[in-house]
């Protein structure tokens, strides 16, 4: 499926336009009634078209050292996933540092740098060896987390959506098509700095579950569709940020992602 087909297919999935957005990361609203909702989109590198976001899936504890620091045993048990709303996207253009609002209700706000896969095909029960055929391209992203709320809900045996799924909780750079990258990223440095100090420093090859395996596992629980994106997990040494901090994220082969906590 080419990029134009991707957008045409996804247009049927959501109300509102999928291209020509007024604001980066948010679609221009063509709503004629109060009940129509604008489509969230992300710029595509090398194209004037934009990637329409249907769902945001995230995998938890997909690097062994991070699993340990979160109190888990990093064995190859089936992975677990959670979701963020599509409008949690905050698009950040390469070469810029975007203002990112410190959220309400938290006193322990954490960064998590991640590789993001964007799908242009979907299905159910997708075999791992066929899963990468679903991937349109990749981006660098942040899974921002209200850690105190996440842990508090976990301690109470309650869903911790409030710690993960909130406004602006998914900063992301542009989508780089596979044709531009030349290959699916499976190794290479992934790091994050806060105010110039390295906090996270790992390699994509250290993922417990590869992107292909994540797609396969997800497709057993959900019917995946064009427009889905998958945050593929973060390395160890997650930690807090406060207002005024500047976060710089890097993945080899992709432009850095920068935000300032405001």
Model-predicted segments: where are they?
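Short beta-strand-to-turn element immediately C-terminal to the catalytic PLP-Schiff-base lysine
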Residues: 83, 118-120, 141, 178, ...
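N-terminal export signals
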Residues: 5-26
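Extended, compositionally biased flexible segments
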Residues: 29-130
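Structural motif
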Residues: 55-57, 79-81, 114-116, 137-139, ...
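Hydrophobic, well-structured mid-protein blocks that either form specific transmembrane helices
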Residues: 125-162
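Catalytic-pocket segment enriched in acidic/His residues
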Residues: 2, 29-50, 93-96, 147-262
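A residue-level signal for conserved active-site and pocket-lining positions in enzyme catalytic cores
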Residues: 60, 117, 143, 172, ...
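A generic structural signal for short beta-strands and their flanking turns/coil linkers
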Residues: 76-78, 85, 111-115, 134-140, ...
């Amino acid at each position: 499926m080419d990029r134009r087909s991707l957008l045409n297919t996804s247009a049927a999935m959501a109300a509102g336009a999928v291209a020509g957005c007024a604001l980066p990361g948010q679609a221009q609203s063509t709503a004629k009634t109060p009940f129509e909702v604008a489509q969230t989109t992300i710029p595509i590198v090398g194209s004037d078209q934009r990637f329409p976001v249907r769902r945001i899936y995230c995998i938890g504890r997909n690097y062994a050292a991070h699993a340990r620091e979160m109190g888990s045993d990093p064995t190859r048990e089936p992975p677990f996933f959670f979701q963020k709303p599509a409008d949690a996207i905050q698009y950040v253009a390469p070469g810029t540092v975007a203002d990112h609002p410190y959220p309400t209700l938290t006193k322990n706000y954490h960064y998590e740098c991640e590789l993001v896969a964007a799908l242009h095909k979907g299905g159910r029960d997708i075999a791992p060896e066929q899963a990468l055929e679903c991937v349109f391209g990749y981006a660098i992203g942040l899974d921002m987390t209200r850690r105190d709320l996440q842990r508090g809900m976990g301690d109470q045996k309650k869903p911790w959506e409030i710690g993960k799924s909130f406004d602006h909780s998914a900063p992301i750079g542009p989508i780089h098509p596979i044709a531009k990258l030349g290959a699916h990223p499976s190794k290479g440095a992934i790091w994050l700095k806060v105010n110039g100090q390295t906090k996270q420093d790992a390699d994509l090859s250290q993922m417990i579950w590869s992107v292909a395996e994540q797609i396969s596992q997800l497709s057993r629980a959900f019917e995946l569709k064009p427009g889905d994106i998958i945050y593929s997990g973060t390395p160890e040494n997650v930690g807090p940020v406060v207002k005024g901090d500047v976060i710089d994220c890097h993945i080899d082969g992709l432009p850095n992602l920068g935000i300032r906590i405001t």
